[in-house]
Amino acid sequence: MKILASDFDETIYYLDDPEKNKMNCEAIRNFVANGNIFCIITGRNYTDLKQLLIANNIPYSYLICEDGAKIFNNMDYCLDTVLLDENDIKQIVQIIEEYNWDYYLDDGYNHTNNYNDCVKIVINCIDEDDKRKTVDIIKQRTNVHIYASRTHVNIIHRSVNKKHALQKLINLEKLDYNNLYVIGDNDNDYEMLKSFNGAVMKRHNPILNELGKKEYESLKDYIEELMNN
């Protein structure tokens, strides 16, 4: 039995490539049908992700959402949550309002106004220079985990990343580290790719080059290789 933890966007799912989506989803179904464990690990919240999983008929053993702040089993029971500190939220919101940035708080399922039940702050931002400036400003004034994705700047608790979430999952569910493989394409995949056996998508963030991981054209190709070895 093998355990595969895969990033979602631009690894499993592509907005602009339905044919690749179809091939990846078929490969995932085959992987799970053969008794393997499949975990999706993503920056998306549970609600957004679940809608796409249903629409594309994607099976899973575990979901790790919000970059590791929420962990679910295949019954959608939440195994673990890491909230942002209320004081951190207040400090960050103050900075955001100083600069008049567009943002929302996320509780892991939906937008929220509750500072006591927030796992992520999301700042809407598309321009690359603006994203870098936003990250730098917040890094200088707070102690949180912050990174830029394609259309957002994402802020989570300082202890949260995909690597730590996978370590938690393995301990909670008594899984075998030696059977774990990971795959991703972006900088929020860096820690898990550095720590576990795995691969990167051919189209990936250049920051992952230093890890020296084998590149794959599609998730389907990687799954087929795992199943044949």
Listing of model-derived features with the role each one plays in the protein:
Residues 1-6, 26, 172-175:
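Non-catalytic pre-domain segments flanking phosphatase-related domains
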Residues 2-4, 61, 180:
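The start of beta-strands in P-loop NTPase/AAA+ ATPase cores
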Residues 2-18, 193:
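Asp-based phosphoryl-transfer active-site loop
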Residues 11, 46, 188:
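Conserved Rossmann-like nucleotide-cofactor binding loop
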Residues 15, 19-109:
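Active-site phosphate-binding/coordination module
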Residues 39, 64, 181-183, 199, ...:
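Hydrophobic/aromatic beta-strand patches that form the interior of the parallel beta-sheet core
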Residues 95-195, 203, 210:
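Conserved acidic, metal-coordinating active-site core of Asp-based
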Residues 176, 195-229:
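Asp-based, Mg2+/Mn2+-dependent phosphohydrolase catalytic module
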